[in-house]
From Swiss-Prot:
GO terms for cellular component: cytoplasm. The keyword rRNA-binding does not apply. Belongs to the SdhE FAD assembly factor family. This is FAD assembly factor SdhE. It comes from the Bacteria. It comes from Haemophilus ducreyi (strain 35000HP / ATCC 700724). Pfam families: Sdh5 (PF03937). Gene3D superfamilies: Flavinator of succinate dehydrogenase. GO terms for biological process: succinate metabolic process. InterPro entries: SDH, SDH_sf, SdhE_FAD_assembly_factor. Keywords: Chaperone, Cytoplasm. An FAD assembly protein, which accelerates covalent attachment of the cofactor into other proteins. Plays an essential role in the assembly of succinate dehydrogenase (SDH, respiratory complex II), an enzyme complex that is a component of both the tricarboxylic acid cycle and the electron transport chain, and which couples the oxidation of succinate to fumarate with the reduction of ubiquinone (coenzyme Q) to ubiquinol. Required for flavinylation (covalent attachment of FAD) of the flavoprotein subunit SdhA of SDH and other flavinylated proteins as well. It is found in: Cytoplasm.
């Protein structure tokens, strides 16, 4: 991803829901660079969804809209449990 987008991505990681803040920002800071380009695009796409949607996916209350987002959510969950 273009270096110019890093600030925007980091800003979008800051969520209105504190629980999501505690999950998404640390994942971004620790693992984003290690993701493939496709996974990075999926991460950015995931950030465009609302906090309630993201929270439901992370808490397994409803399925994510794509397999790629589901896989990324599971990586975020695994990073929390590690």
């Amino acid at each position: 991803m273009a270096e110019l987008n890093r600030f925007k991505i980091e800003w979008q990681c800051r969520r209105g829901m504190r629980e999501l803040d505690k999950m998404i920002m640390p994942f971004y800071q620790q693992y984003f660079e290690q993701l493939s380009e496709a996974e990075q695009r999926t991460f950015v796409t995931m950030l465009s969804y609302t906090d309630p949607e993201l929270f439901r996916w992370v808490m397994h209350q409803s399925p994510a809209p794509t397999v790629a987002i589901s896989a990324l959510i599971e990586r975020i969950r695994a990073s929390i449990e590690a």
